[in-house]
């Protein structure tokens, strides 16, 4: 086929979608060019279904190539390795809005690969990758109820909302939001903000949805001209006989099981009912059904029972109404040797969160297409299998753990002090020890508590809450603080984090084909109520950061010196600074502007290092007494080292009142003496005297503790 292009304006960028030139053997392939950023997006779908696979096998792989910015990869092998955190997060960002648009029952394997071929570093390539994926699916012929559009939205008081901000514009923006959706509805939101109001967040979502229509129109035009014929795929037919048989015998029993408030007991009861259903209905005899069909029908029955009760306004699975937060238990300072710790429990979801402070040298070095940078705030989320009562594989973090950790980080990050105000590297680890819904938001609450316990001066405490949705033709219900079952059986996962003043993070994933403004507004309002309730409970335990960091944390001090004295502190080949560190046990960071940061295991070591640095960088004062050591003797006097790196001359006439014929009669090299500074000439040569030190001055000086 001949190449086909469609071009449209997107904010201040020109976007071109091209197909038919590159990767022509893929089911669908689109090259997206956004200014000088180029991303190749491919889709391959298998025609055959693996009958042993009980789920939809969609995989998304976003990869950044270093040649895109004219670089060769580091490391021994000099090639790209396993996915970076950025690549993993972007893969999830692409996956989330497209997954609900594949029809129910479609089980063919679909693989999406997005490769960044070139980037101008002005824009994150993620939006180009999302648009390219949508376009590749739209032209592939695969059953897909798209296309979707995607937009990044920024906001500040001067400009209001703005589309497709550059990396530089995001630095001054109060919002970084990615919105994705179809022509009619929003499907996904991912954002971080600086305490924006709920109305401002909702406005950003609506603005992004409105602006993405240009992209959707262009993608649809590309599909109309270059799209392949749609697959002749039909959804599997429901076996109404099986569903009726299940409902007749098990609907009431399933309803009773979902009135058991304890999660593990409820799961045991449902498992027993499922086994009973399989025993009665599954088999190879006449009138029996395949085991997989029975399992699928039983899952549908569970979903229908729970959803219908919620829509009818009945109590939820654990007996709550739609707006009630589960009981909270909050503890801080629970781990004795850590720098800060908290245990946050909400119902059957629990997070043990630990904050650790380190030096700026502990900051993580991140290499990306945008260049190298150091990250001094790390938040890691761990979800071990025991948290849900299972035995499972223990290994490195999975995509879900990386994504939940980043969401929790977004919720807290806006409240952190600046590096100038708090020059520590901060690591927070959230260990999920129990899980029954919204563990990422428990991590936000626990992180805020642990950071305050560690003495990190947060601008304000933050809390997070997860909202759910059940929607059908009869109406909808928004649920506050959803359980795991409500998340699984519902239509939306809507997570909001923030302070009393506003929202710091918002994430939304829709499992149906979009929601409207009314539902989002209701969810934001209920989330606001719940967040204030949780913050009120948190404040009864710890309302503000501790005034000092933990005694177990590194002692840190910052001093300013004359920038011209930096070389004196470093010394020849770094000898001086190494000696200070070896002698005191402290570590020292120097900035070009003369800022000296000193880190030590305790305050004594920090003070010793400070005193040494100040002594090295101090200027001698005329008339002041110093304790020095004779460094060298000459015929005309003696050179005395009286400050680190600073010598002065005691002339032969300034040793004693009487005449001196031989300096060595009075002084010897290595001898300790008390000297007075007489003068400093314009070449910074220091004149010292021993004889001018009076007996009274000497006695007072020796009585003063050495600094």
Swiss-Prot record:
The keyword Isomerase does not apply. It is an enzyme of class 2 (transferase). Mg(2+) binds at residues 487, 493. Residues 623-691 form the S1 motif domain. It is found in: Cytoplasm. Belongs to the polyribonucleotide nucleotidyltransferase family. Its EC number is 2.7.7.8. GO terms for biological process: mRNA catabolic process; RNA processing. Involved in mRNA degradation. Catalyzes the phosphorolysis of single-stranded polyribonucleotides processively in the 3'- to 5'-direction. HAMAP family: PNPase. The keyword Membrane does not apply. One of its GO terms (molecular function) is 3'-5'-RNA exonuclease activity. CDD domains: KH-I_PNPase, RNase_PH_PNPase_1, RNase_PH_PNPase_2, S1_PNPase. Its main location: cytoplasm. Transmembrane segments: none annotated. Keywords: Cytoplasm, Magnesium, Metal-binding, Nucleotidyltransferase, RNA-binding, Transferase. Its cofactor is Mg(2+). It comes from Chromohalobacter salexigens (strain ATCC BAA-138 / DSM 3043 / CIP 106854 / NCIMB 13768 / 1H11). Component of the RNA degradosome, which is a multiprotein complex involved in RNA processing and mRNA degradation. This is Polyribonucleotide nucleotidyltransferase. One of its GO terms (cellular component) is cytosol. Residues 554-613 form the KH domain. It holds the Pfam family S1. It comes from the Bacteria. PROSITE patterns: KH_TYPE_1 (PS50084), S1 (PS50126). It catalyses: RNA(n+1) + phosphate = RNA(n) + a ribonucleoside 5'-diphosphate. The gene is pnp.
């Amino acid at each position: 086929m001949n190449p086909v292009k469609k071009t449209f304006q997107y904010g201040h960028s020109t976007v071109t979608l091209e197909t038919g030139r590159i990767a022509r053997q893929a089911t669908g392939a689109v090259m997206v060019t956004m200014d000088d950023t180029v991303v190749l997006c491919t889709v391959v779908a298998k025609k055959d279904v693996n009958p042993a696979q009980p789920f939809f096998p969609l995989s998304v792989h976003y990869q950044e190539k270093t040649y895109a910015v004219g670089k060769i990869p580091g490391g021994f092998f000099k090639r790209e390795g396993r996915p970076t955190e950025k690549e993993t997060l972007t893969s999830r960002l692409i996956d989330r809005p497209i997954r609900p648009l594949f029809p129910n029952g479609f089980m063919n394997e679909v693989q999406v690969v997005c490769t960044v071929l070139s980037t101008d570093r002005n824009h994150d390539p993620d939006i180009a990758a999302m648009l390219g994926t949508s376009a590749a699916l739209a032209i592939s012929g695969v059953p897909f109820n798209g296309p979707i559009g995607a937009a990044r939205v920024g906001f500040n008081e001067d400009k209001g909302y703005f589309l497709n901000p550059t990396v530089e514009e995001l630095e001054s923006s109060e919002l970084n939001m990615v919105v994705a959706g179809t022509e009619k509805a929003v499907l996904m939101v991912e954002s971080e903000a600086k305490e924006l109001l709920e109305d401002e967040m909702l406005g950003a979502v609506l603005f992004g949805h409105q602006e993405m229509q240009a992209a959707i129109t262009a993608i649809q035009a590309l599909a109309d001209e270059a799209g392949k014929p749609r697959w002749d795929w039909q959804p599997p037919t429901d076996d109404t006989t099986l569903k009726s048989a299940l409902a007749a015998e098990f609907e009431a029993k399933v309803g009773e099981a979902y009135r058991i408030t304890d999660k593990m007991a409820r799961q045991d009861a449902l498992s027993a009912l499922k086994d009973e259903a399989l025993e009665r209905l599954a088999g190879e005899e006449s009138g029996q059904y395949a085991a997989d069909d029975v399992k699928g029908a039983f899952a549908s029955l569970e979903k229908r029972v729970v959803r219908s009760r919620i829509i009818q306004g009945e109590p939820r699975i654990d007996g709550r109404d739609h707006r009630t937060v589960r009981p909270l238990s909050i503890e801080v300072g629970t781990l004795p040797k850590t720098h800060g710790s908290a245990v946050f429990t909400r119902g059957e979801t629990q997070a043990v969160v630990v904050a650790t402070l380190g030096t700026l040298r502990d900051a993580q070095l991140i290499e990306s297409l945008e260049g190298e940078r150091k990250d001094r705030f790390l938040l890691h989320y761990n979800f071990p299998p025991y948290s849900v009562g299972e035995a499972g594989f223990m290994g490195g973090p999975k995509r879900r753990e990386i994504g939940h950790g980043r969401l929790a980080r977004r919720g807290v990050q806006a409240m952190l002090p600046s590096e100038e105000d708090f020059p520590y590297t901060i690591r927070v680890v959230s260990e999920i020890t129990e899980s029954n819904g919204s563990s990422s938001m428990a991590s936000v609450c626990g992180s805020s508590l642990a950071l305050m316990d560690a003495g990190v001066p947060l601008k304000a405490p933050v809390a997070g809450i997860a909202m759910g949705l059940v929607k059908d033709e009869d109406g909808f219900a928004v649920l506050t603080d959803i359980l795991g079952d409500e998340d699984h059986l519902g239509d939306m996962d809507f997570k909001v984090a923030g302070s009393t003043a506003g929202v710091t993070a918002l994430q939304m994933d829709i499992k149906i084909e979009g929601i409207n403004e009314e539902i989002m507004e209701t969810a934001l309002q209920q989330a606001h109520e719940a967040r204030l309730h949780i913050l009120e409970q948190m404040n009864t335990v710890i309302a503000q950061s501790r005034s000092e960091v933990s005694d177990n944390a590194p002692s840190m001090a910052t001093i300013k010196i004359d920038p011209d004295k930096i070389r004196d502190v470093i010394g020849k080949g770094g000898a001086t600074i190494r000696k200070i560190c070896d002698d005191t046990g402290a570590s020292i960071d120097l900035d070009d502007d003369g800022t000296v940061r000193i880190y030590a295991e305790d305050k004594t070591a920090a003070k010793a290092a400070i005193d040494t640095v100040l002594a090295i960088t101090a200027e001698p004062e005329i008339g002041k007494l110093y304790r020095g050591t004779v460094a060298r003797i000459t015929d005309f006097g003696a050179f005395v080292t009286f400050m680190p790196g600073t010598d002065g001359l005691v002339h032969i006439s300034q040793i004693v009142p009487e005449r001196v014929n031989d300096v060595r009669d009075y002084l010897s090299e290595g001898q300790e003496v008390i000297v007075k500074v007489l003068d400093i000439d314009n070449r910074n040569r220091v004149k010292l005297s021993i004889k001018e030190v009076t007996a009274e001055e000497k006695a007072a000086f020796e009585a003063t503790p050495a600094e």
